[in-house]
């Protein structure tokens, strides 16, 4: 017997097995899995009643809230494709995504209503806008109220045995940090098997770091429109754990929810972890329930891992993946048989880690062959497995470029050691080539981050008449701390080969970032290459 693989089955299972258990916490509201599933089914019914067709793209523009989580199941239950929108995108970028996807319906949170109103003239395919909170009578008459929508008709129970598991379930657009956003098509099968692979990965370490269970309480600190955020939504549902929603990341609010809801785990980007470790407010809250923080979205560092474990009292491991891979490919929990301690252990936990079950991962050199597993030879990470995307939406050429010879080419350059742990060196297009030598910006950034005065650092190439390009550091200092350019350059020279060291340091007040805290190096490079032709990429 073959039954289609679809994440719709996860919420159906949680409703049947954990009906009275609190499944979702959002502000002062609490929903059992029975209530959560009922609301998702009513959303599906409302969409079907409004003649939503199988394959329609339905967009949602919202911060993390219970309604966004309901959309993950209700939209799929109606046979449609979920299209989460990045709230940090500029209006013209959002309009591009909506037009590219040809979205029919839009769900929008009240703060973003002005954007939704502008889409009436810039996005011809949009037919109906639903207001997630607030009242259309007071805010915008053209919108329809979400809760009235759910109350207005019966729930719709999708017959998941009739779902095509290879049809598109979710359409996520890449961040566009280096080029225009591309729509990543993830199928029902992709999403279903990713959740099971992540659950299995939690059992591949004797310490069970990152393990999910019915006792898990997950704080959604990363926006659900981002890979690191939505990658956990289905995993916690199928085991009957508890979702805790937070609209915006703020250390005090995070600490308060961790204390009040007895949060056990969360995923964060490095800048979020750094903000928690540097906040003096943590002393006012009980964080003893917190077991694990999974760091992803950008490269971590041994210094950050050590500081977080010491100050937050929990384990920190790294996760690696991409939007195109559903997203998780690897985790850095320590395998059985290894006995790393001290600095070696912190270094291993800051690595991308080893492949999770169901993923085949290789590091290939320029000749197309696997690099030696010596921790120093570099190559591009390629992967294959059941969680790899179907392709890029309406971009067959980009799909063909990324999916070659049966493997997805990630564009990430890495090393692999004798224990099969990978270490990300850089994005392929962000390797600095100075006088013929390859320099990893991440390697230099990790050294700078170890300086006691440095809060965060970014290293980019800048033009140089002799070497073509040389590394330059942009450093944000910790509040109240000081450091000079010469001090930081000497710090690097004591720890790096001379050619890898930055030639200069600037001290901006902040670094431009995506909605999830990833530094926009494209914006930084543009400032320094403005006088050069065709170099910004």
Can you name each region flagged by the protein language model?
Residues 19, 131, 136, 151-173, ...:
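Conserved pre-ATP/AMP-binding loop-to-beta segment of ANL
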Residues 49-50, 77-148, 479-481:
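Structural core segment of the AMP-binding/adenylate-forming
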Residues 3, 20-65, 69-73, 90-95, ...:
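Conserved AMP-binding/adenylate-forming core of the ANL superfamily
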Residues 32-34, 169-197:
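Conserved AMP-binding A3 loop
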Residues 89, 106-108, 258, 266, ...:
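AMP-binding/adenylate-forming catalytic core of the ANL superfamily
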Residues 192-217, 225-264, 279:
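Conserved AMP-binding/adenylation subdomain of ANL enzymes
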């Amino acid at each position: 017997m073959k039954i289609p693989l679809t994440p719709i089955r996860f919420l159906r299972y949680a409703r049947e097995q954990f009906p009275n258990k609190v499944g979702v916490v959002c502000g002062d509201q609490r929903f059992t899995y029975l209530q959560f599933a009922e609301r998702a089914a009513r959303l599906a019914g409302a969409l079907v009643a409004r003649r939503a067709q199988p394959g329609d793209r339905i967009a949602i523009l919202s911060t993390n809230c219970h309604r966004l989580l309901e959309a993950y199941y209700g939209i799929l239950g109606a046979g449609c494709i979920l299209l989460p929108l990045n709230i940090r995108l500029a209006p013209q970028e959002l309009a591009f995504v909506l037009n590219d996807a040809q979205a029919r319906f839009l769900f929008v949170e009240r703060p973003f209503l002005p954007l939704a109103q502008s889409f009436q003239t810039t996005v011809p395919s949009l037919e109906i806008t639903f207001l997630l909170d607030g009242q259309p009578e007071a805010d915008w008459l053209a919108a329809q109220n979400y809760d009235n929508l759910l109350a207005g008709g019966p729930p719709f129970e999708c017959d998941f045995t009739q779902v095509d598991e290879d049809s598109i379930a979710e359409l996520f657009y890449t961040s566009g940090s280096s080029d225009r956003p591309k729509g990543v098509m993830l199928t029902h099968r992709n999403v279903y098997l990713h959740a099971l692979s992540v659950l299995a990965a939690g059992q591949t370490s004797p310490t069970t770091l990152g393990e999910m269970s019915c006792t898990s309480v997950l704080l959604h600190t990363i926006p659900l429109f981002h890979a690191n955020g939505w990658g956990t939504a289905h995993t916690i549902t199928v085991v009957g754990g508890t979702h805790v929603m937070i609209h915006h990341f703020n250390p005090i609010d995070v600490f308060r929810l961790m204390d009040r809801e007895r949060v056990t785990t969360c995923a964060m980007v490095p800048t979020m972890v750094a903000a928690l470790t540097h906040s003096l407010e943590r002393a006012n809250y009980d964080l003893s329930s917190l077991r694990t923080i999974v760091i992803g979205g950008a490269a971590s560092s041994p210094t950050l891992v050590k500081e977080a474990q010491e100050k937050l009292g929990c384990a920190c491991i790294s996760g690696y993946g991409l939007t195109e891979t559903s997203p998780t490919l690897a985790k850095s929990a320590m395998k059985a048989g290894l006995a790393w301690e001290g600095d070696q252990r912190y270094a291993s936990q800051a690595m991308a880690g080893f492949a999770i079950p169901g993923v085949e991962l290789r590091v290939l050199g320029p000749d197309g062959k696997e690099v030696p597993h010596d921790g120093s030879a570099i190559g591009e990470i390629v992967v294959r497995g059941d969680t790899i995307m179907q392709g890029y939406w309406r971009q067959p050429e980009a799909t063909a470029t990324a999916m070659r010879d049966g493997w997805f080419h990630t564009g990430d350059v890495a090393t692999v050691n004798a224990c099969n742990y990978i270490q990300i060196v850089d994005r392929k297009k962000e390797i600095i080539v100075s006088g013929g030598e390859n320099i990893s910006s991440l390697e230099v950034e990790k050294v700078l981050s170890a300086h006691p005065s440095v809060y965060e650092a970014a290293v980019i190439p800048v033009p140089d008449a002799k070497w073509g390009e040389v590394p330059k550091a942009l450093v944000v200092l910790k509040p109240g701390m000081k450091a000079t350019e010469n001090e930081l350059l000497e710090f690097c020279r004591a720890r790096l080969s001379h050619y890898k060291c930055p030639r200069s340091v600037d001290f901006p007040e902040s670094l431009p970032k995506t909605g999830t805290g990833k530094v926009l190096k494209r914006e930084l490079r543009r400032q320094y290459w403005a006088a050069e032709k065709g170099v910004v990429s």
